[in-house]
Design a protein with these regions (language model features):
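N-proximal low-complexity "stem/linker" segments adjacent to membrane-targeting elements
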Residues: 27-104
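Catalytic metal- and UDP-sugar-binding loop of GT-A-like glycosyltransferases, i.e.
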Residues: 144, 169-171
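Conserved nucleotide-sugar donor-binding catalytic segment
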Residues: 220-247
Length: 247
């Protein structure tokens, strides 16, 4: 396994960050300590962010340009309104604002953002939501007078929505600019689709993407033991209502 761990990281060795890793490995090879133990230690150190950044830089070449996105969108047979429902509770402004701005930056424009504050006690959270309320007709904000917890608060956010598809986004999530575009492109390939889920990753405090979670195609056996759907998920409205919403 150790051998394959090294081989899997070879592309990184030719990057700037990879050279540092290689130097670390070589210096440890000539030390008096056990080679296998030392190599394992190097490979287990936090180089994952650098490796993932290398992967993302390569994938960036595959991203469609603005003109390509416009061309695709104009050709779409289906251009559904996507309602993004987001329950909010005591979220720091820096994360909540990033979530809102990420939605506003979407390349697919037929969306609405439905924010329901679950009786936050953080004045920072309340003030920010008040500051954006009624500033954009596509952004709906409502305030609860009691804490209902996430399931019922999500239902309250859903009550603000009108779209034929709903998207689930946490108050501290940030969407890729083409997230909704990719969702609608998939819907146009299969107009009977009811549920879409995506890969996800995390952001460091400095804004670097890390800890990718690459998900399989739908796997009923895996799903029995691992709820890998989560973020980012998009559900047809009628199916969500038929299921009885969140409970």
């Amino acid at each position: 396994r150790l051998f394959f761990d090294i081989i899997s990281k070879l592309p990184l060795l030719f990057s700037k960050d990879g050279i540092k890793v290689l130097k670390s490995i070589l210096s440890l090879i000539y030390s008096k300590s056990d080679l296998n133990q030392k190599l394992t230690k190097v490979l287990s150190t936090d180089n994952s962010t650098a490796i993932y950044q290398h992967f993302l830089s390569r994938k960036a070449w595959e991203e469609p340009t603005e003109s390509e996105i416009l061309k695709f969108t104009q050709a779409f047979k289906h251009k559904p309104l996507i309602s993004i429902i987001t329950p909010v509770y005591n979220c720091p402004k820096i994360y909540l604002e990033a979530a809102v701005e990420g939605v506003k930056a979407q390349s697919y424009k037929n969306w609405e953002l439905c924010l329901y504050d679950d009786c936050s006690t953080s004045q920072e959270t309340i003030d920010y939501l008040k500051s954006i309320k009624d500033t954009n007709p596509k952004i709906k904000v409502a305030f609860g007078n009691q804490n209902l917890h996430i399931s019922e608060a999500s239902n309250k956010a859903f009550e603000l929505s009108t779209g034929s598809f709903i998207a689930l986004m946490d108050h501290d999530d940030t969407l890729h600019p083409n997230a909704l575009f990719e969702v609608v492109k998939f819907i146009n390939k299969n107009d009977e689709i009811d549920f879409i889920y995506s890969d996800e990753d995390k952001l460091t405090i400095d804004g670097y993407q890390t800890e990718p979670y690459f998900k399989s195609d739908f796997n009923p056996d895996l799903f029995l033991s691992n709820n890998y759907l989560n973020h980012f998920s998009v559900i047809r409205r009628s199916v969500f209502e038929q299921a009885g919403k969140f409970r």
